[in-house]
Amino acid sequence: MNTLFDKIWDAHVVTTVEDGPTQLYIDRLYCHEVTSPQAFAGLRARGIKVFRPEKVYCMPDHNTPTHDQDKPIEDPVSKTQVDTLTKNAADFGLTHYGMMDKRNGIIHVVGPERGLTLPGMTIVCGDSHTSTHGAMGAVAFGIGTSEVEMVLASQCILQSRPKTMRITVDGKLGKGVTAKDIALYMMSKMTTSGATGYFVEYAGEAIRSLTMEGRLTLCNLSIEMGARGGMIAPDEVTFEYIKGRENAPQGEEWDQAVQYWKTLKSEDDAVFDKEVHFDAADIEPMITYGTNPGMGMGITQHIPTTDGMNETTKASFLKSLDYMGFQPGEALLGKKIDYVFLGACTNGRIEDFRAFASIVKGHQKAEHVIAWLVPGSWMVDAQIREEGLDKILEDAGFAIRQPGCSACLAMNDDKIPAGKYSVSTSNRNFEGRQGPGARTLLASPLVAAAAAITGVIADPRELM
């Protein structure tokens, strides 16, 4: 009867308060520079040590510049936050992957690629996109700063048990359709609140066909549907990805781990609180047109009209389109764009750079387009160079920047100017997310690449 979520959650319950929260043991805490300073300050004020320092990994990513990382950070706020994390990690005896450390990168890219995120774990971080790690078959979710302090002090957290939802995507994915498109399609149908209160398990033939990188992308976007987290049962794809990585089990321990991981799946008779089904054949390359990730459509489609909308929905819809400079019923194909961003914890992995390179190879970047290609980690950067993707990208007029969160959010130097259109592989298109007045169009690396070389919104299938 147990779901995958139930198995992992129940294995980590320390105690349950009647009609209250569960005390849940946490296997891994990730800390970055933005949401951790007050947590460490709280420990200092109480004279508390970190309970299990070996379970905590720290790295800056949000504020790190994507150029000249060997020089002091110019922005004083960013410098303070990055320096504070360095000091806190040193003071409390925590593992810290600082800027220019070849293990550094975006926390949700580094965790899986370093073998720090493993099936069956409970994982938290003061960051909403912690759901990414669920792709490995873990229960992973974002927490607030006061909860970060709680985990640092006790290695436990108080949480109410969420409901469970299974989203099944049956059938085979079409040409040019990626995990990013699956996620944007789901949100366009379910809205950004469609999974609120649920922990989602993704299943079905289309999900199983995804690479590990694709699964990480899909689970990353779970939070944008309102879900507490997302997860995929581990299988041979997962095991092959983990095997031999820096912190992965070795030798006999590996064999024992895989034996256990194979039990981490929902039973055939498992009951979910809600079941949702989609057909892979209905999904095409997607793009957003509004100011939340649920305002997406197939790239060949038209922006919806206001027909049938109530006044409240209509007002919100039109306000969003006004910000974007679009009209109801308008097509986006052929629309001129200004910026392209490849990166973020959503699409900053090696597979994403391979996809982007496959489209731009033999072409040239459109002259007016400014493109920021930002690896999610130094490991991804090294892979790009090992595979010769840097040569393909540079020949096409693109430069590769240094790792970091970059233009996903306006917390560093990489900001989109007001009124400019950015085709972005990141996860949020809220007003001002990429910079005050910036207009963000969320898409896959394939769609971003097509826009980068044509200078307009284009269907990547025509370039494949």
Curated annotation (Swiss-Prot):
Annotated InterPro entries: 3-IsopropMal_deHydase_lsu, Acnase/IPM_dHydase_lsu_aba_1/3, Acoase/IPM_deHydtase_lsu_aba, Aconitase_4Fe-4S_BS, Aconitase_4Fe-4S_dom, IPM_dehydratase_rel_enz, IPMI_cat
Cofactor(s) needed for function: [4Fe-4S] cluster
Molecular function, one GO term: 4 iron, 4 sulfur cluster binding
Keywords: 4Fe-4S, Amino-acid biosynthesis, Branched-chain amino acid biosynthesis, Iron, Iron-sulfur, Leucine biosynthesis, Lyase, Metal-binding
Pathways per UniProt: Amino-acid biosynthesis; L-leucine biosynthesis; L-leucine from 3-methyl-2-oxobutanoate: step 2/4
Family matches, as Gene3D superfamilies: Aconitase, domain 3
PROSITE patterns per the UniProt record, alphabetical: ACONITASE_2 (PS01244)
Enzyme nomenclature, EC number: 4.2.1.33
Catalytic activity: (2R,3S)-3-isopropylmalate = (2S)-2-isopropylmalate
Single Gene Ontology BP annotation: L-leucine biosynthetic process
Domain of life the protein comes from: Bacteria
Disulfide bond annotation, renumbered to this chain: none
Record-linked Pfam families: Aconitase (PF00330)
Co-factor note (free text): Binds 1 [4Fe-4S] cluster per subunit.
Stated role: Catalyzes the isomerization between 2-isopropylmalate and 3-isopropylmalate, via the formation of 2-isopropylmaleate.
Family: Belongs to the aconitase/IPM isomerase family. LeuC type 1 subfamily.
Annotated protein name in UniProt: 3-isopropylmalate dehydratase large subunit
Species per Swiss-Prot/TrEMBL record: Bacteroides fragilis (strain ATCC 25285 / DSM 2151 / CCUG 4856 / JCM 11019 / LMG 10263 / NCTC 9343 / Onslow / VPI 2553 / EN-2)
Classification lineage: Bacteria, Pseudomonadati, Bacteroidota, Bacteroidia, Bacteroidales
